[in-house]
Regions:
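Short amphipathic alpha-helical segments at helix-loop
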Residues: 147, 185-186, 264
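Terminal, charged accessory segments of proteins
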Residues: 1-182
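Catalytic core segments in nucleotide and nucleic-acid processing enzymes
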Residues: 190-346
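A short, highly charged nucleic-acid-interacting micro-segment common to nuclease
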Residues: 152-156, 182-201
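Generic alpha-helical propensity signal that fires on short helical segments
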Residues: 59, 63, 129, 184, ...
Length: 346
């Protein structure tokens, strides 16, 4: 399958992670063709900012310092003396200004400037440049030191998706120094794809199988004595059918290699097996439900890929792959088959 299909599927995965992408304002993106993931993200952020401009750019109070002939706000005495502004019959004052030069708008502008250095189409770059006009009074921000712990309220909640996409873009395109030259990193590395893959599978099951109450549930240890130093156990996806008293724990994995080699012998990643086994056995001890587990790897190009059913210590386990490089309808069928095999046909 072509790289174009994988890029398109990444967009669909994002549409589950960011539900706003399913709104009409973004529908035309689905029909576009992209050269790479950077081009796709540029299209999303362009459309997102265009939609935001139809409302308004977020404003907030920022502190401005200026030399003024009339008093405003707080007088900066030391600065006024140092600059001898009184000789010009002026004072250095600091005051609050309701401005579009907000922290989030700085992130948006810096993201646009970063994308202009990326490998995206000329028409896309022209579209991004046209948006910069609206940010002429907005300062840039150091993209290496952004505080992503942003606060949202009724006035800026439409920025939540924009900031999420900006974070993916900036972390994917951060410039690194190598021999004095700046270069762009791979846009979506293994770590970022791992988080997107996990979020996609969880949100897919939340949307299409609400009766299974999909969530990233915590698992308590079946232990006696002091347990405060035991690591927490949080599943990627837990599905629960209360009527059938069945629980399925899914641990998603996105690796460049879904198998490990030990002494020239291929095997499943031992840490992953221990992890899913621990989740299932500890969960089973705290419930009357039948508990099963799946290690769900994103499919790679390896000769040997996981695809096996196992019974371990009386519990059913699967180690299987999800092929992301197929038409999205086929991708959905793979996810639906997991539900069918574990809750419907079982």
């Amino acid at each position: 399958m072509s790289n174009e299909i994988l890029i398109k599927n990444i967009y669909y995965m994002l549409s589950y992670a960011f539900q706003v992408l399913n709104q009409n304002g973004y529908k035309n993106i689905e029909t576009e063709r992209f050269n790479n993931t950077a081009d796709m993200f540029a299209a999303i952020i362009q459309k997102g900012i265009e939609n935001q401009l139809k409302r308004y750019l977020n404003r907030e109070y920022v502190i401005e310092t200026d030399s003024l002939s009339t008093l405003r706000g707080k007088i900066e005495i030391n600065e006024s003396i140092n600059q001898m502004s009184f000789l010009k019959k002026k004072l250095i004052c600091s005051y609050d200004e309701f401005s579009i030069d907000s922290y989030m708008n700085r992130i948006l502008k810096s993201t646009l400037l970063l994308l202009l250095k990326a490998d995206i189409s000329k028409s896309r770059k022209q579209g991004l440049k046209s948006l910069l006009v609206y940010f002429s009074s907005v300062h840039e921000i150091d993209v290496h030191h952004i505080n992503w712990k942003l606060q949202y309220n009724q006035n800026n909640q439409t920025y939540q998706m924009l900031m999420g996409i900006c974070k993916l873009i900036i972390q994917g395109l951060l410039q690194t120094q190598s021999n004095g030259k700046s270069k762009l990193m791979d846009f979506l590395d293994e770590q970022r794809m791992c988080r997107l893959y996990e979020k996609f599978v969880l949100e897919y099951y939340k949307k299409h199988y609400p009766e299974l109450h999909a969530n990233a549930a915590m698992v308590d240890w079946d232990a006696e004595g002091e347990t405060q130093y035991l690591p927490s156990m949080q599943t990627d996806i837990t599905l629960c059918d209360e009527k059938q008293k069945k629980i399925l724990i899914i641990d998603t994995k996105y690796y460049n290699s879904s198998m490990q080699l030990q002494f020239e012998r291929a095997s499943y990643h031992s840490g992953n097996m221990y992890q899913i086994l621990s989740y299932v056995k500890n969960k089973e001890s705290k419930t009357k439900c039948k508990v099963s587990g799946i290690l769900l790897y994103a499919k790679t190009n390896e000769d040997i890929t996981p695809n096996q059913h196992l019974s371990i210590l009386g519990n059913h386990f699967e180690v299987r792959t999800l092929d992301l490089n197929v038409d999205f309808s086929t991708l959905k069928s793979q996810l639906d088959l997991i539900i069918h095999n574990n809750f419907i046909a079982a």
